[in-house]
A protein has these predicted regions:
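Short helix-to-coil transition segments within interhelical loops
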Residues: 167-173, 177-197, 226, 237
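Transmembrane-helix boundary motif in ABC transporter permease subunits
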Residues: 92-121, 138
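Transmembrane alpha-helices
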Residues: 149-153, 185-219, 251
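Periplasmic/extracellular loop-to-transmembrane helix junction in inner-membrane transport proteins
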Residues: 16-26, 52-97
Length: 286
């Protein structure tokens, strides 16, 4: 067995089990998505009924049907601002991902480095991002750059914390085995620690990409002339509440879509981990 095979075995990777039947897989997807869809339809139905029965004014609480109508009528306006927000989220998330993985790798090198750096990482999250955003506008000016930084600041923390935990979760016996096989520190990191930490990294990335949407909106609230956050701020004084809700709907859809995309990359990158989880679930159900 070569070093790569030993590393894969040490990292807990097993031969890929046979895929489930396609009809069973489709049934499983339907069963998984049916409850949330039913709850969403129920909430929207109750919301619509409440507004209609009690004749609630549109500027106070628009009905879902009015929000959908606004989404259609203002499709061009919403799409234009959505493009800006998506750009801010993707670039800021990419910055957070790169910085988070590098910082986590440095922190995981030794306990001394962890004790020196980790307190500052935690302290960075105690400062409200709404306070930092105006300072970035003063230092950098208007434009997309401050929004990128705001998104990165709000998204990098879960990536760092989860990746550090993943890098430190390696079995010491596996490390000793690789050293016995002649692997150096770099080989141990690339072939053992990094593969082992990927499930943790993707867990942090899914959280990070969801909160990245919040970071983009906060940046647009503080100072911007484009984006869904700016559109919401501009619509509020005009009592265009239905447009605010339409923007919220688009933001929610954006967050869910990005979360699902990261999950898809996760399944393609570490199929062995998902197979192991699936087998554990099957054993638990049986």
């Amino acid at each position: 067995m070569n070093t790569r095979d030993e590393a894969s075995s040490a990292a807990g990777q097993e031969p890929r089990p046979p895929e489930p039947d396609s009809s069973e897989s489709m049934r499983a997807r339907v069963v998984r998505w049916l409850p949330p869809l039913a709850i969403m339809v129920g909430i929207l139905g109750l919301w619509e009924a409440y507004v209609r029965i009690f004749n609630v004014q549109k500027w106070l609480l628009p009905a879902p049907s009015v929000i959908i109508e606004t989404r259609v009528v203002d499709a061009g306006l919403l799409s234009r601002h959505t493009v800006t927000t998506v750009e801010e989220v993707i670039v800021g998330f990419a910055m957070a991902l790169a910085a988070g993985v590098i910082l986590a790798s440095v922190i995981a090198l030794s306990t001394t480095i962890e004790r020196a750096i980790y307190p500052f990482v935690i302290a960075s999250q105690t400062i409200p991002i709404i306070v930092i955003a105006p300072l970035l506008l003063i230092w950098i000016g208007y434009g997309l750059a401050p929004k990128f930084i705001v998104v990165a600041l709000i998204a990098f923390f879960p990536i760092v914390v989860n990746t550090v935990d993943g890098l430190k979760s390696v079995d010491p016996d596996s490390v000793r085995l690789m050293r016995t096989l002649g692997a150096n520190r770099r080989q141990i990191f690339m072939k053992l620690q990094l593969p082992t930490s990927l499930p943790f990294l993707f867990s942090g990335a899914k959280i990070a990409v969801a909160v990245s949407v919040i970071g983009a909106v906060i940046g647009e609230w503080v100072g911007s002339s484009q984006g869904l956050g700016y559109l919401m701020i501009r619509s509020k004084p005009q009592f265009l509440t239905e447009r605010v809700f339409a923007a919220i709907f688009v933001l929610s859809l954006m967050g869910i879509t990005l979360f699902a995309l990261v999950g898809l990359v996760e399944r393609l990158s570490i199929p062995w981990w998902h197979n192991e989880r699936r087998n554990q679930a099957l054993r638990h159900d049986s």
